[in-house]
């Protein structure tokens, strides 16, 4: 996961300016298990959608009856029932919460159409963000690990490519 350019990506809004520093190229494929939209505050302007994506056994329909997924203010939650063929460590290593920063309007529109259990492929960059919003300094950093948990373990994902089932958006 390396990125050949140190060129920052700038996003400007009426009340803020944000600089994203690319850290790594990133690709994730799986099924979307939960989606949450945001519109208020500075983070909702930059990253209007969070997608929880799962792969491996978690993407198999026969396991849906054992696991439920949800999201709340930038956090991803799951519960599994007794008899589940997967355990806590498997869920952690086979799912992720992605804070989506659409590269353009077409990507944003595509992300909004993703439905639960859609098979998706997303490509782009993991970024750290710094900026100002309404005169306040803000920062937001991505995770670069697939094994971390808790606060700071989500991917801050600048998305440049979306495939939903067989449809491609760039």
Task: Map each language-model feature to its residues.
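OB-fold and OB-like single-stranded nucleic-acid-recognition modules
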Residues: 1-170
């Amino acid at each position: 996961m390396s990125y050949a350019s140190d060129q920052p990506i700038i996003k400007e809004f009426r009340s803020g300016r944000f600089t994203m520093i690319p850290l790594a190229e990133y690709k994730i494929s799986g099924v979307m298990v939960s989606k949450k939209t945001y519109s208020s505050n500075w983070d909702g302007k930059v990253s209007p959608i969070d997608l929880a994506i799962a792969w491996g056994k978690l993407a198999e329909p026969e396991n849906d009856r054992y696991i439920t997924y949800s999201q709340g203010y930038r956090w991803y939650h799951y519960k599994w029932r007794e008899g589940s063929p997967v355990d806590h460590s498997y869920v952690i290593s086979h799912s992720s919460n992605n804070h989506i920063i659409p590269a353009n309007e077409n990507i944003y529109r595509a992300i909004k159409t993703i439905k639960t259990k859609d098979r998706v492929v997303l490509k782009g960059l993991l970024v750290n963000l710094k900026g100002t919003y309404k005169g306040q300094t803000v920062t937001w950093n991505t995770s670069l690990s697939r094994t971390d948990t808790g606060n700071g373990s989500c991917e801050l994902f600048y998305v440049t490519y979306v495939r939903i089932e067989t449809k491609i958006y760039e």
